Swiss-Prot record:
Residues that coordinate or bind GTP 2: 183-190, 230-234, 295-298
UniProt entry keywords in alphabetical sequence: GTP-binding, Nucleotide-binding, Repeat, Ribosome biogenesis
NCBIfam families hit by this protein: GTPase_EngA (TIGR03594), small_GTP (TIGR00231)
UniProt protein name: GTPase Der
Domain KH-like: 353-438
Subunit structure: Associates with the 50S ribosomal subunit.
Source domain of life: Bacteria
Annotated family: Belongs to the TRAFAC class TrmE-Era-EngA-EngB-Septin-like GTPase superfamily. EngA (Der) GTPase family.
Length: 452
């Protein structure tokens, strides 16, 4: 069975994300002074003693306001409770019980999930006991005085929490593929996530920038497990104010770093923008495999040549990503969305691929035969002794040469193009490491690598 889920519920600005960070032992959720920072429900692992579980951090609940996001946040909170084994209701010990707390408590009593009442911001253990007693009136049992920032009282809360979780069972760890959905604001990342999930999991709104956390969702398809990461849209730095959006963009960059494959979402109407080029550079820099997802294809007037023309225009801008598979989709209508995971699988396979040293040196030998290494003005010619793959994700090949400085950028690009031509590696960048090596060292290495 999957890990049990613990939902964290409460009104805005009571410290839900701070407590979630404490339980998860990290700073994953955005914590900022602006109320209502967490809009979607976000998942990450937590543990206590010998028990593992998933923490679900939800948006701030308000029942007396129907503006824009609040009905959507209520839906997200209910969805979190429906999949949870237990819930932690967080209240603010410094303000005392509020009307909002009473409304949430009434609502929670109607849910079939055990609820623990955590009275947050009780920084003093002695004063915290007094602050906590005010919350008996909520009718949810024993209030636990805690400090999400300092950790006071969280041990007792967790001791009781794990008694409500299902008994430990063997959990088979699948070979999970982590997929980050990356793109500028409002290109349809959350709509794409929803289309992949088949449910309304991430908040979708026409307002640019409505996904502010990196949100992990685990799905299975054809016995393969995928972790889908929907991120905040990435804007130009000059358009980003210091605050929650700044941290979200940081989170998106971290999502690129920790994923296996990037679904790089591009707006079919706008085409490849300058900001897309900067994003592409970042993806290459992190060595991630890529699937180019051209979204909003339903909004484009098409004839039999349209896809060819679009591909030509896209790769004229993203010429350094010509190896990336490309798919034209509509997240709104579902057009071709079911083909995306096939491309994710093939790109992941190439990203993890290993090539034998013998094959690498066959490619090098043919490449050098067709185009000799350059010669310096002093008449000294570059020489490639041999190559070998030293790592994967991305595939990285070390080339041992007499002097790396003798190989200009044009020749380095030529060698990379020969590896692409002979070995393929579609969907993933490859890295070439040019390493200087003396003749004597090469001779000593001859027993484990074929010289070119």
């Amino acid at each position: 069975m999957p890990l049990p889920i613990v939902a964290i519920i409460g009104r805005p600005n009571v410290g839900k994300s701070t407590l979630a960070n404490r339980l998860a032992g990290d700073q994953h959720a955005i914590v900022h002074d602006e109320p209502g920072i967490t809009r979607d429900r976000t998942y990450r692992p937590g543990f206590w003693q010998d028990r593992d579980f998933q923490i679900v951090d939800t948006g701030g609940l308000v029942f007396d306001d129907d503006t824009e996001f609040l009905p959507l946040i209520r839906e997200q909170s209910l969805a979190a409770l429906n999949e949870a084994s237990a819930a932690i209701f967080v209240v603010d010990g410094q303000t005392g019980p509020t009307t909002g707390d009473l409304e949430i408590a009434d609502w929670l009593r109607q849910q079939p999930v055990p609820v623990l009442l955590a009275v947050n911001k009780c920084e003093s253990p002695e004063l915290g006991l007094i602050q906590a007693t005010q919350f008996w009136e909520l009718g949810l049992g024993n209030p636990y005085p805690i400090s999400g920032i300092h950790g006071n009282g969280t041990g007792e809360l967790l001791d009781d929490l794990i008694t409500y979780l299902p008994p430990p069972e063997e959990i088979t760890q699948s070979d999970e593929i982590k997929v980050a959905i990356i793109g500028r604001p409002n290109v349809g990342k959350s709509s794409l996530l929803n289309a992949l999930l088949g449910e309304n999991r991430a908040i979708v709104s026409p307002i640019s920038g409505t996904t502010r956390d990196a949100i992990d969702t685990v799905i299975q398809h054809n016995e393969q497990t995928y972790r889908l990461i929907d991120t905040a849209g990435i804007r130009r730095k000059k358009n980003v104010e210091y605050g929650a959006e700044f941290f979200s963009i940081n989170r998106a960059f971290k999502a690129i770093r920790r994923c296996d494959v990037v679904l790089f979402v591009i707006d079919a109407i706008d085409g490849v923008t300058d900001q897309d080029l900067k994003l592409a550079d970042r993806i290459i820099e992190e060595g991630r495999s890529v699937v180019l997802v051209i979204n909003k294809w339903d909004a484009v007037d098409k004839d039999s040549y349209t896809i060819y023309e679009y591909k030509t225009n896209i790769f004229s801008r993203l010429y350094f990503m010509e190896w990336a598979p490309i798919i034209f989709v509509s997240a709104m209508t579902g057009q071709r969305v079911n083909k995306i995971l096939e491309l994710v699988n093939s790109s992941t396979e190439e990203h993890r691929r290993r090539v034998t040293t013998a094959v690498i040196n066959e490619v090098l030998q043919e490449a050098v035969t067709w185009h000799s290494p350059p010669t310096t003005r002093q008449g000294k010619q570059g020489k490639i002794y041999y190559g070998t793959q030293v790592s994967t994700q991305p595939p990285t090949i070390a080339l041992f040469v007499n002097d790396p400085k003798r190989f200009n950028e044009n020749y380095r690009r030529y060698i990379e193009s020969q590896f692409r031509k002979q070995l393929g590696f579609p969907g993933t960048p490859i890295r070439l490491l040019w390493r200087g090596k003396k003749v004597r060292e090469v001779e000593q290495s001859a027993n484990r690598a074929t010289k070119v």
